[in-house]
Amino acid sequence: MSGSFWKFGQDYSIESPVSKILNSAFIKINKDQDDDVPTGTCEENIADDEDNSSHDYAASEDNVVNENEEKEEENTLPTTESEYENYRPNLDVLDDLLDDDELYTELMCSNFKLLIFLKYPEVLSKLIEYVTNEKILDEETDSAKKPEIIEGVNDHPILIERDRKDKKEDAEEGGDSEETTNDSDHDSGDERSVDSEETSITLPPESEEQVETRRARIAAEILSADVWPISAAIMQNKDLLGRLWSILDHPAPLPIPASTYFMKINERLLDMDITGMLEFILSRDSLVARFLTHVDNPSLMDFLLKVISTDKPDSPTGVIKILKSQELIPKLLDHLNPEYGISTQSAAGDFIKAFVTLSTNSSNELASGIGPNELTRQLVSEEMIEKLIKIMLKGGTSLSNGVGIIIELIRKNNSDYDFIQLVYTTLESHPPTDRDPIHLIHLVKLFAKHMPDFADMLDKTKLPLMEMPFGNIEPLGFERFKICELIAELLHCSNMTLLNEPNGEMIAQERDIERAKELETSTEKENITFIVDNKSSYYDKDCVEKDITENLGALQINNQGSEEDELNDTGVSSVKLDVKSDAKVVEGLENDASGVELYDETLSDTESVRECLREKPLVGDRLKIALEDTKILISILDMFTEFPWNNFLHNVIFDIAQQIFNGPLKTGYNRFLLKDYLVDAYLTKKIVDADKACQDYEKKTGLRYGYMGHLTLVAEEISKFKEYIDEMKLTFCNTAVSDRLEEPFWKEYSETILADTREKYNTVLGDFGNDQESDDDVIRNSDSEDIIGDTEGNENYGNGENDELLSNGHDSGNMDLYYNFNNNENEENEEDYAEYSDVDNKNYYNNVETNDDDYDSDDGKSKSAESEFTDKISEHRDGNSLYNEDNDENGSDKWTSGTSLFPPDHFPSRSQPSDPKLQDQNIFHHQFDFEGVGDDDDYMDPNDDGQSYARPGNPLYTTPKTPPRPKTILFNSLSALDNNGEDEEVALGTSVDDRMDNEISSDEEDSEDEDEENDMGNEEGYSLYRSRSKEAF
């Protein structure tokens, strides 16, 4: 036992250290004060008596007293939970329990006394005190600080010794042995000293801070353990939860260990009792402010996201209403300002993006999503978007985080993927709710308004040159890249169907007004059981009223007295009428402008159409108009060649170009962006010049510019666009676009450079084209010529009976049977294989041949697959040719010569047809005749499932009767491979294997006896004899 790694004793009756500690962990309430003295006091009294007696007597007396007390305490402790009501916990043993390594293991093993002890409120309070200790909360990342080391500690190693029980057992065993000599004692002492040296390690003593940190970690593990009694005991004492949540009141930054403990414990309680936990959380004052104090703490913000995720559409919990009433979204946007640190800005932006992802509008995006809600609706409101844009225009990290939020909003709330399209709904059929999909009308309109500001930022941003191995270049910079990315995403958003519907904005505004009224009514009537302090409103009505006032301009709001929370019905009605009338005007203008080209092949891109669209633009067209006015798309396109090594920028520019060339041509303002790209920006000329510049640069440096891949993609988009308008026979009223596409230099580039590049892109990777034919191709061509040559002298060719046969005889399946022969031989040489013998032999497995490559070729006993193949060809070249003229005279025998592709011991024969007349039919005629295909082979397949029986007239299960096999192994048709076969016959004819001759002769004798039996069976029409395995063929 001394050298074993097992630290537990073999005696299962021995108590664990935790159980021993728990024996003194309970104090009976009705006991006298003397009996209530803890174990530590008794030990002190015993220690005082040691001064008046000898050390040995005192030590033995102490052991006896402790053992008696432990036995007595063990016998007196109750065995049921109800009986522990008369006991109180002994908190003095809690530190000993936390210091024991087996505490958590005992807890997960449901130690009864341990669970009873930990359920006491006093014990739980002590554990929470460990977690919320000021030393833990004030812990700084000062890992460089070393604990104070007592002098002389490092001079003496600390020995990790065996358990005291093991030492005691070893001592008892040593006492029982009477024949032990002094030498043996000396040897055992040396062995123990060696063990001590091997297991010794020098460790500095733990400081007080380290001890408290370790105990806090164990306390957090206990409180967050998946043990229902402990979690239930915590939930029954709200004061304990209040002390735990006091961690949030600690000033930032909060140490990561403390926040991790907080998250683990609360997540466990939330999973166990979601109703009780949410009731407690929502009753906290200033919940949002307390969390945002630690916004850069990932553990706390992750827990807040989990709390939000409990408010689902089918089971609302009121969390979203509370967070909105406490202005979560505005306060988060405030943290994006440059006044805060970069880490705080990034943390706030990441939280908003995670919340948008959680509230995605796509039903199949996240199974645990909560869908659109009032928080995301507030985020895309006019006030919040205006606030976000102003923060983004400050540049730096604020711009980067803002662009990320906008991109996430657009991608997760695409109205084209709504289950029910908004334009096909009415207030009666689909009454608005707080879970309706959100629209991005305000977002697009406000970014169109501030587009000149972003264009100025894009043009004015300049960065110092950066030194690179190939020269000094100007870096693009994060701000310019983010603006380009923002423009591409806004262009995606402007193509949404809702934003290009004449009535889309009107319908959305109507639903917003109705939703505000309904939420106001429900707020007055609803009584949420979770909320204790509801002084603040659940819905920010002032924000909604401001949006409606600014957008519609006709809504009268009464902000006095009791009418503060009500909307003026008369104002709403007038607003609806005005919006409807405006929508009719817009629709009429659109029809007037584009009604001609709806069913016409001429695309109206005249100035009159442009002015009509600009006068009353739709939401999507408003953004495109802003892009055209600011010329920001052309500026971004010019950056393509200005930053030839930034592939991120090139990908964004290609995305923009792809949207423009694939956008609508007959409706909307996209056709004018297309004109700007091709005419004003002269995109075709830019592509040709960029390609020429790359060629010149390659000649000088041997390098190609990094934009060439995306340059080809943009050129392909133009090429596809030209093919589309040619195929659809579309023409532009303004011929400038067509003229650009018909210019000679562009045609030359498209037909030469672009075509060659397209061909290279479409080539299979690694397929460079083989100039020389392979050996297999030569064999295939020879066989094909052989068949064609034989058919010229075939009398039966062309009579209709054999035409189909010859056309199908040279199929890929039969030819591959031969072409893969060499490969099969090589595969068989790579591993051992077993040959099957005839049934007459008692042994199914004749012999096992090892790999020929394992032996030396000089022994003469083994040959390679290639030499055998050559010998077999040479021996039987003059045997029976596949297309012999003699065989042509007798059509029925032409395809039934007894040749075989494989040696007879490897593969079985196939069964004869049930009807002898079927033998002459072409369906059974194969290009290659196989040796041993007749019924004379009695091979039994051990893998046969017993279900493959011959069926009459079925070509898949029957084969024609074949005559006895001649002495040939391989195809007779291989004579066509070489016209000078006679010269090779003399050289190769004498190299036939003797073993093959013996096997063939024995097979011929067996075939004569079995042919008569098979013929008798075939005379009756069909038989149920089992067919041979077809897997070999």
From Swiss-Prot:
Ranges of biased composition (kind: Polar residues): 909-924
Residues carrying Phosphoserine: S774, S857, S862, S892, S991
Sites of Phosphothreonine modification: T990
Keyword Lyase: no
Region (Disordered): 32-82, 147-213, 768-813, 828-1033
Keyword annotations: Cell cycle, Cytoplasm, Phosphoprotein
Pfam entry (one): SAPS
Stretches with biased composition (Acidic residues): 171-182, 784-793, 828-838, 932-944, 1000-1018
Locations listed in the record: Cytoplasm
Molecular function GO labels: protein phosphatase binding; protein phosphatase regulator activity
Principal cellular location given in the protein's record: cytoplasm
PTM comment: Hyperphosphorylated in the absence of SIT4.
A single GO cellular-component term on record: nucleus
Leader peptide range in chain numbering: none
Bias (Basic and acidic residues): 158-170, 183-195, 858-879
Purpose: Positive regulator of protein phosphatase SIT4. Involved in the general amino acid control (GAAC) response regulated by TOR. Involved in the dephosphorylation of the elongator complex subunit IKI3.
Subunit details: Associates with the SIT4 protein phosphatase catalytic subunit in a cell-cycle-dependent manner.
Family: Belongs to the SAPS family.
Protein name in the entry: SIT4-associating protein SAP190
